[in-house]
């Protein structure tokens, strides 16, 4: 019991640091740090976006904003979004954007301190918590072959940001910061300004992305910390240490009545969920809950998840957002792969004295397949081919030098080949290589006002091979024994998971 109290409660020395967050909003370097972080994030992406914040950000505006913050009421910043603010003399959208980005930097301070301190106290290697997203697949290879059913669901987003503000009160003791956060939220009272709904997921608007990412990650952290604990408690039926978690979730006096009712029946509910072979995996806004049990057990977890979100976070999950699949019959759309468990049979010859027996041996194996059709659709959206998969030229790159054009196409192919190196069937990557290579040739031919055949005849096909074969050469130097048995062209058969990938490939987001 004391262990979970220490997990839930902040140290007094650390909680006092949270009382002094608001004065940081009056420091110029906070906004400069927020602007610098955004510039680094955008420079690492494939496409650079120019926003109003980039075009209008300056230290002079920040100084004027800080001066007015000390003189005026918070609500004076947000009285009018379209016209000039009489106190500031500028459009309030720019000021609110700068203030939001600075506010996120301030809020990240106590959470980063808590993470670092927890790692130091537990002596946990930092790389253990910051490992590659490709580490999920070796876990699937080891665990999923022994499981039967998987619950594939999208984590529901919060209905109202006020719920998150109330949750933040547990972590941030600074009342002034919370009041300012409420003022910023009321400015975006229209939910469509914050979140754009899609068929299977949702995305944040570009103007508020950094702010909403922080709130959403905090929402997921709260959900996982409680749900994971309750899931673990299903194997310890006599434990009552789940009560502090319920006190942490039900915000103060608003839910006391329901809390009393729920805790009385909670221990009986956990009895029906006892499953020592339950595994939980989260990636982006999706999650998997896999079980070795029967369909009835995973269906109970399905019902429990819906009630868990509704009662704890006031979030509703649509029926189509949760799917129960049998691993032997269905494929999972996981991180750009189609993953499934298939039975593979082999014959073993056994001889005892003069008798010879043939024994059929069946084993399960995880198959990870590249979804070629959605990937071609992503290439088509990026203007590398048409919707049918026929390569086309890239006119916007025709003004670059030949080396820059080849380097861009080669880098895109190497990134795709690097990301999908763990595929069980790599023949589909030949199709992707063909599209990117011919698109590069057509772009070069367009630049030199020639045909593809005439251009390749004049320069030779070795001009493109040098760049597209770099990935295979790196692999052959790293794994010489495996590469000796690889297929022609360097596309090896065995899955190789690169554990240095920390973000999903842009072309793997088939949305």
From Swiss-Prot:
Record flagged with keyword tRNA processing: yes
Annotated protein name in UniProt: Maturase K
Molecular function per GO: RNA binding
Job of this protein: Usually encoded in the trnK tRNA gene intron. Probably assists in splicing its own and other chloroplast group II introns.
Taxonomy, superkingdom: Eukaryota
Family statement: Belongs to the intron maturase 2 family. MatK subfamily.
Transmembrane region(s): none
Gene name of this polypeptide: matK
Subcellular location: Plastid, Chloroplast
Record's GO cellular component terms: chloroplast
UniProt keyword annotations, A-Z: Chloroplast, mRNA processing, Plastid, RNA-binding, tRNA processing
Major site of localization recorded for this protein: plastid
A biological process from GO: RNA splicing
Any Pfam family the entry gives: MatK_N
